[in-house]
UniProtKB/Swiss-Prot annotation:
This is Pro-glucagon. It comes from the Eukaryota. The keyword Signal applies. Gene3D superfamilies: 6.10.250.590. One of its GO terms (molecular function) is hormone activity. It comes from Carassius auratus (Goldfish). Keywords: Cleavage on pair of basic residues, Hormone, Secreted, Signal. Residues 1-21 form the signal peptide. GO terms for cellular component: extracellular region. Belongs to the glucagon family.
Amino acid sequence: MKGAQYLAGLLLLLFVQNSICVPLQDYHTSTETVEGLLARGQGFTTAKRHSEGTFSNDYSKYLETRRAQDFVEWLMNSKSNGGSAKRHAEGTYTSDISSFLRDQAAQNFVAWLKSGQPKQE
C-alpha cells in the first residue's frame, strides 16, 4: 500500500514540475490574430455546409429513384391486372369483327336479291 502512495506522490510531483516549466502565454504576446481565428472557424462551417449539402443531394437522388421504382411497379401492376388499355384493344377487335360480319351479310343479301331466287325456308 505504501508503494502505491509513493508512486502517486511521484506522479504528482512530475505533473507539477512539468506545469511550472511550461510558461503561460500572455494575451499580448500571442502571435495568433483575430482574423486567423475567424479564418480557421470558417473552414469548419464550410465543411459542415458541404456535408449537409452532400446529404441533401444524396437523399434527393434516393427519393427520386424510389419514386421511379414505385411508378414502374404501379405500371406493371395495372398492366397485369387487365388495365383499360387491354379492354380497349379487345373492344376494338370485337367491334371490327362485328362490322365486318354485318358488311358481309349485307353483301350476301344484295347478291341474293340480284339472283332473284325464291326465299328458302
